[in-house]
UniProtKB/Swiss-Prot annotation:
Intervals, Mitochondrial matrix compartment: 1-15, 67-72, 153-155, 224-232
Xref: CDD domains: Cyt_c_Oxidase_III
Keywords recorded for this protein, A-Z: Membrane, Mitochondrion, Mitochondrion inner membrane, Translocase, Transmembrane, Transmembrane helix
Mode of membrane association: Multi-pass membrane protein
TM segment ranges: 16-34, 41-66, 73-105, 129-152, 156-183, 191-223, 233-256
Protein name in the entry: Cytochrome c oxidase subunit 3
Source species of the chain: Equus asinus (Donkey)
Subunit note: Component of the cytochrome c oxidase (complex IV, CIV), a multisubunit enzyme composed of 14 subunits. The complex is composed of a catalytic core of 3 subunits MT-CO1, MT-CO2 and MT-CO3, encoded in the mitochondrial DNA, and 11 supernumerary subunits COX4I, COX5A, COX5B, COX6A, COX6B, COX6C, COX7A, COX7B, COX7C, COX8 and NDUFA4, which are encoded in the nuclear genome.
Family: Belongs to the cytochrome c oxidase subunit 3 family.
GO BP, sorted A to Z: mitochondrial electron transport, cytochrome c to oxygen; respiratory chain complex IV assembly
Length: 261
């Protein structure tokens, strides 16, 4: 395409939606195989396909936006709407877990001992590691905002520092969460408490890992001078996503760790 008379991006044919769908099929099938038959072959294949797809798809998007100029102001507006709708869909995704938790905890059945936490469950102390995790994520929210404001002001050094601090705090949170899982006295098999706790906090942990990956990509891009004060939607989307992850954790902490204990 040599000439166009509009500001929209006519996307070229791409194999990545197909390979992405294939990787999703392999990962979900692989999880079932791992749970039931203790075989990790399909899961590993799905993860490998997913990583390769993500890398090559992001590479294409970066090339189209940064080097080929396809992301005009109209295209960026559409991407903003898309990111907002994606975050709204994530809100409903986590709402299901909160619904399951409150449905079980507000009116505990006789099978649970008529109390919450259920008989025999020793919940984690909300004033120990969970409170530290809350502080870590709140601090990361401050540092990502600092990075964003620095970018808007054209201060590249401070932007990189703020982004590096945010990524470090995200990795630290993930390690703390992993240690908490390792030391917990209950498992995902321990009735409705174990299942709601590990599914809700586990999916949040997965979102922290995804958000950290998103921010690492932004950090590497900024090292190559991809973002300017007026053209940086990739970073803005990552910041929105990170703030969403922060807010979800606050609800998890208040509901499951503090009130639920």
């Amino acid at each position: 395409m040599t000439h166009q008379t509009h500001a929209y991006h006519m996307v070229n044919p791409s194999p990545w939606p197909l390979t992405g769908a294939l990787s999703a099929l392999l990962m979900t099938s692989g999880l079932a195989m791992w749970f039931h038959f203790n075989s990790t072959l399909l899961l590993a294949l799905g993860l490998l396909t997913n990583i390769l797809t993500m890398y090559q798809w992001w590479r294409d998007i970066i090339r189209e936006s940064t080097f080929q100029g396809h992301h005009t102001s109209i295209v960026q507006k559409g991407l903003r709407y898309g990111m907002i709708l994606f975050i709204i869909s994530e809100v409903f995704f986590f709402s299901g877990f909160f619904w399951a938790f409150y449905h079980s905890s507000l009116a505990p059945t006789p099978e649970l001992g008529g109390c919450w936490p259920p008989t025999g469950i020793h919940p984690l102390n909300p004033l120990e590691v969970p409170l530290l995790n809350t502080s870590v994520l709140l601090a990361s929210g401050v540092s990502i905002t600092w990075a964003h404001h620095s970018l808007m002001e054209g201060n590249r050094k401070n932007m990189l520092q703020g982004l590096f601090i945010t990524i470090s705090l995200g990795v630290y949170f993930t390690l703390l969460q992993a240690s908490e899982y390792y030391e917990a006295s209950f498992t995902i098999s321990d009735g409705v408490y174990g299942s709601t706790f590990f599914v809700a906090t586990g999916f949040h942990g997965l979102h922290v890992i995804i958000g950290s990956t998103f921010l690492i990509v932004c950090f590497l891009r900024q090292l190559k001078f991809h973002f300017t004060s007026s053209h940086h939607f990739g970073f803005e989307a990552a910041a929105w996503y990170w703030h969403f992850v922060d807010v979800v954790w606050l609800f998890l902490y208040v509901s499951i760790y503090w009130w639920g204990s």
